[in-house]
Amino acid sequence: MYDNMSTMVYIKEDKLEKLTQDEIISKTKQVIQGLEALKNEHNSILQSLLETLKCLKKDDESNLVEEKSNMIRKSLEMLELGLSEAQVMMALSNHLNAVESEKQKLRAQVRRLCQENQWLRDELANTQQKLQKSEQSVAQLEEEKKHLEFMNQLKKYDDDISPSEDKDTDSTKEPLDDLFPNDEDDPGQGIQQQHSSAAAAAQQGDYEIPARLRTLHNLVIQYASQGRYEVAVPLCKQALEDLEKTSGHDHPDVATMLNILALVYRDQNKYKDAANLLNDALAIREKTLGKDHPAVAATLNNLAVLYGKRGKYKEAEPLCKRALEIREKVLGKDHPDVAKQLNNLALLCQNQGKYEEVEYYYQRALEIYQTKLGPDDPNVAKTKNNLASCYLKQGKFKQAETLYKEILTRAHEREFGSVDDENKPIWMHAEEREECKGKQKDGTSFGEYGGWYKACKVDSPTVTTTLKNLGALYRRQGKFEAAETLEEAAMRSRKQGLDNVHKQRVAEVLNDPENMEKRRSRESLNVDVVKYESGPDGGEEVSMSVEWNGMRKMKLGLVK
């Protein structure tokens, strides 16, 4: 039997040379099952033989049974040995899989290190180029010095002639108003930011952020999105130290680097440290670019946002007002970026209960948006919604209701044409259902008038919020049927919007998996509820989106 088993094992080993690892594991599992079955069978036979041996007397027949029992025991030992070896093979397979997984992780780390190495190589190449240019400049200056000394010896008699000449060794560079573009901004915002940057460049000198700082910014964002602040912070500090050594502390590039580091601290909720860095960047930009530069306005705005996150609205307000003055001076009083700043200032005033100022700022921003961007621009609806929320805070329900109806009517007209008896916006249907609730229980089917919002893409969040707010206002007035109609529409609109966003994100991931590295961390601070979102210059853009349920509770979103 042992010879036969050895032969079988030899045959199996000969076959293993041609099997894949998965096939080996599968065969091993089958062998384990077979050996377990044989072991159970041998145990049963052994028990039977032992019971037979007890019944027999000591004679030749009992000796034969005892010999069989010994053979069964040897077979059981061999079966247990085979099972042990099979289990060792399975454990080895699991270990190899773990090793392979670890190897994949190490490969990912190697790729990351290669990226960092490439960045360092680029930095080294850039430094070498600068060194070469500096050496050439030194050699040229030495030649010029020798020439001037020779000419001076020839013209010693002429004391009135001076060989010195004035040279401008360095021109002040101007950082962009918007440090790095925000990929999550909507197209309208992107166009406005480009226009703002172009205007600032035309007036102030067309400053370009160095490519190495953009590369560093992307690396820092990637690390911060993964929560690896222990890598991102030292990387920023080292780059800042290098810039200060090469360019000095009072240089626009240093201010840019301070903004990047402030962004990292902001993501860690270290608002005090971030504010200190922005104050330093503000001082540098005021000194190197002038106090009325667009970059100074951007830094003032970002600093105001950080104060807002800490609830220091009184300290934030003068900073925001100064940023507004600069933008009005540089861009003109009717520029869309001025309207953004007005929205931010209105938000800060609203948190302090200065409702008259809030109304003024929102009305002025609304006028700019309607004049410059047109009545169908998303910012128009958003600003109307913000102004309506201000009215609600003061109990001016009629004015708020009028604005909400204007938003819904405009959205309806944009999708379905002018309003008439056969083409009504949803708030009209809601009020008709309220009037007819006693006469007709079921009312009009939602499907007859509820599909208008499906085509609203840009305005869908604002429209949904408006539906909720107007519904809450109806409920406060006792118009429960109308309120339920609008709330049902808001729920369907929100569900459809979430489905569309989900599909879009899935499509983006399928087309470009690396897009998932984008990180835009967003924090919220409850005042009534204030939500700040990331904006240009590594800082904040602030606007407002307000939801009201009749209990004076608000959700405030972005401050630029």
Swiss-Prot record:
The modification Phosphotyrosine is found at residue 449. Its main location: other. GO terms for molecular function: kinesin binding. TPR repeats lie at residues 213-246, 255-288, 297-330, 339-372, 381-414, 464-497. Keywords: Calcium, Cell adhesion, Cell projection, Coiled coil, Cytoplasm, Cytoplasmic vesicle, Cytoskeleton, Microtubule, Motor protein, Phosphoprotein, Repeat, TPR repeat. PROSITE patterns: KINESIN_LIGHT, TPR, TPR_REGION. Oligomeric complex composed of two heavy chains and two light chains. Interacts with SPAG9. Interacts with ATCAY; may link mitochondria to KLC1 and regulate mitochondria localization into neuron projections. Interacts (via TPR repeats) with TOR1A; the interaction associates TOR1A with the kinesin oligomeric complex. Interacts with BORCS5. Interacts with MAPK8IP3/JIP3 and NTRK2/TRKB; interaction with NTRK2/TRKB is mediated by MAPK8IP3/JIP3. Interacts with CLSTN1; phosphorylation at Ser-460 inhibits interaction with CLSTN1. This is Kinesin light chain 1. It comes from Pongo abelii (Sumatran orangutan). The lineage of its organism: Eukaryota, Metazoa, Chordata, Craniata, Vertebrata.
